[in-house]
Design a protein with these regions (language model features):
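Conserved DHp (HisKA) dimerization/phosphotransfer helix of two-component histidine kinases, i.e.
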Residues: 1-43
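Conserved ATP-binding N-box helix of the HATPase_c
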Residues: 63-82
Length: 177
């Protein structure tokens, strides 16, 4: 039932319209839509909204879905091989001088060792560290590349890795109205 609701919500026509997106409302609904799935996987997701009342982004809701669904699915994949017992995804959305700053952090396995010296390579097309049991690369390597491409189409927007002690962190910034 949750997948049906998730699917129907994802294909709403209004998500493909250029509109003013209430970011507080968007992220509240986004997190709520993921909670049942994450609960079954024993992953806690936490949302912090800081100074976000009345904050709008002019854009396509489908763009935000593409970006943040990718972040969640990457975290789920990271937790598959993590020994972490208290699996947590933290989403912090704040209004900072006319910009929406969205920090997305999990306490999973973090970046693969191969990216420690050149972490921004993960934004390249076809770049993946996901391998099968014979060490063949099987991930598409397109998720973060697509996210970066979407973000680059918004004025004064950016995506960057966040340095975190444990796990993985990524920040997106959008100019808001």
């Amino acid at each position: 039932m949750n997948w049906l609701l998730y699917s129907l919500n994802s294909i709403r026509r209004s998500k493909r319209d250029w509109v003013d997106i209430d970011l507080s409302n968007y992220f509240t609904l986004f997190i709520e839509s993921w909670k049942p799935i994450l609960l079954r996987k024993l992953i806690h997701i936490d949302l912090q909204l800081i100074n976000m009342d009345g904050t709008f982004l002019k854009g396509f809701e489908m763009d935000l879905d593409s970006i943040f669904n990718n972040f969640v699915t990457n975290s789920i994949s990271a937790f598959l091989t993590s020994k972490e017992e208290n699996k947590t995804i933290s989403v912090r959305v704040s209004n900072d001088h006319g910009y929406a700053v969205i920090d997305f952090v999990d306490n999973g396995i973090g970046l693969s060792q191969e990216y420690k010296n050149t972490p921004d390579v993960i934004f390249n097309a076809f770049e993946t560290s996901i391998v099968d049991n014979q060490n063949n690369k099987i991930g598409t390597g397109m998720g973060l590349f697509i996210a970066k491409g979407i973000i680059s189409k918004y004025p004064d927007a950016m995506i960057a890795l966040l340095p975190v002690e444990k796990g993985f962190g990524i920040r997106t910034i959008f100019k808001i109205k």
